[in-house]
């Protein structure tokens, strides 16, 4: 069996109801810049939803860069995560981070979330 590193529609939270369900009693993993909220899902794979507020990241190209990096990191680490729905909340300070720095932070948060879910 080969592992697929694609990021398909099935790996995303799409509806407001899916997002809202994550906010009720979530498992949290956070840093100063990013918070991950997660709940178990009924799928066989993790799903992700991203929220990058204009209040914290003013310019569209900056919001897109942040979302692209987080999505790519999720795509590469999806097989290490349990079957959970994850909402990523981006806060102030993430704009100043370099791409590599953001990748490392998100990887650290995936591990933290995994430990909290399994532990």
Curated annotation (Swiss-Prot):
InterPro entries for the chain: Ribosomal_Su5_D2-typ_SF, Ribsml_uS5_D2-typ_fold_subgr, RNase_P, RNase_P_CS
Listed EC numbers: 3.1.26.5
Domain of life of the organism encoding this protein: Bacteria
Q: What Pfam families does the record tag this protein with?
A: Ribonuclease_P (PF00825)
Please list the GO terms describing molecular function.
3'-tRNA processing endoribonuclease activity; ribonuclease P activity; tRNA binding
Give the GO cellular component terms, alphabetically: ribonuclease P complex
Keywords of this entry: Endonuclease, Hydrolase, Nuclease, RNA-binding, tRNA processing
Reaction(s) this enzyme catalyzes, per UniProt: Endonucleolytic cleavage of RNA, removing 5'-extranucleotides from tRNA precursor
Biological process annotations from GO: tRNA 5'-leader removal
Q: Does the keyword RNA-binding apply?
A: yes
Instruction: Write out the similarity annotation.
Output: Belongs to the RnpA family.
According to the record's subunit comment, the protein's assembly and interactions are: Consists of a catalytic RNA component (M1 or rnpB) and a protein subunit.
Its biological purpose is as follows: RNaseP catalyzes the removal of the 5'-leader sequence from pre-tRNA to produce the mature 5'-terminus. It can also cleave other RNA substrates such as 4.5S RNA. The protein component plays an auxiliary but essential role in vivo by binding to the 5'-leader sequence and broadening the substrate specificity of the ribozyme.
Q: Mind telling me what this protein is named?
A: Ribonuclease P protein component
Q: What is the lineage of its organism?
A: Bacteria, Pseudomonadati, Pseudomonadota, Gammaproteobacteria, Alteromonadales
